[in-house]
């Protein structure tokens, strides 16, 4: 799986959340579920993938650009949110 991300957003994500966007590749490889992000019109289809890694839940938001998964953000999420997604 090929990924890409914006270097400025990577720096911001590390500063704000302590997680590099490259970690999204791990989340995508271990994802237990994905849902389309329909909260608003982003001008592109965005997916939210989530995975449990070392007892913690993470989310990776990405969009497909050709065959490349372009990572938009990566962050921790709580188990309550995961259960809500799995019940859909």
Predicted regions and their residues:
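Ribonuclease/tRNase effector modules and their secretory precursors
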Residues: 1-88
């Amino acid at each position: 799986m090929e990924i890409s991300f914006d270097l400025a957003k990577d720096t911001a994500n590390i500063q704000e959340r302590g997680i590099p966007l490259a970690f999204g590749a791990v989340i995508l490889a271990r994802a237990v579920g994905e849902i389309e992000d329909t909260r608003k019109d982003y001008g592109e289809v965005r997916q939210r993938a989530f995975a449990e890694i070392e007892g913690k839940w993470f989310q990776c938001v990405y969009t497909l650009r050709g065959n490349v998964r372009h990572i938009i953000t990566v962050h921790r999420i709580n188990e309550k949110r995961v259960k809500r997604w799995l019940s859909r």
